[in-house]
Amino acid sequence: LRDARPSVWPLQKPHPPVWIAANGHGPVRRAARLGDVWFANPHAKLSTLEEQMGIYRGAVAEHGAGQPEDIVVSREVFVARTRAEALRLARPALEERFRVYATQGQDQQLPPGDRFDLPFEQLAEDRFILGSPDDCIEQIERYRRIGFNYFIMDYHWLDLDDATALESLRLFGREVAPALR
């Protein structure tokens, strides 16, 4: 790797930033109180995250801490030439992934109505970065507008073949990433 650097240096004063992941509203408040960075869950709809961003910023202010430099979100990402193609290629793997999440109860910490046992079209709405390059750019910009500025993007999932995942990643690198700089 040329010109690579770690995103977190091991020795920092007073310490490396403490990232605290949180799904529910209560844990988001706890992340504001105890951590340096809120790591927003990869499961919630954008509307839930927008509500939680307000909760987080309010709790940070209430505890007298300055607003954090970074606020982190993780999302499943799939880019194809068209939204229809992205849905067709990603759907089987995402449906299976969220079916497993539901059996593990991972949606039980989310607000009522934000659940995983929905038809795929409803599940995918505002939950994934999914579509054409232009679709994905617009979706990422929506996360930026509500305050997320550090993205962890999950491109490859069980049940998604390597070649399909790699082509999506290449398309992201060629057409989406340059537009976000």
What are these regions (language model features)?
Residues L1-R181:
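Active-site-adjacent structural elements that line small-molecule/cofactor binding pockets in enzymes
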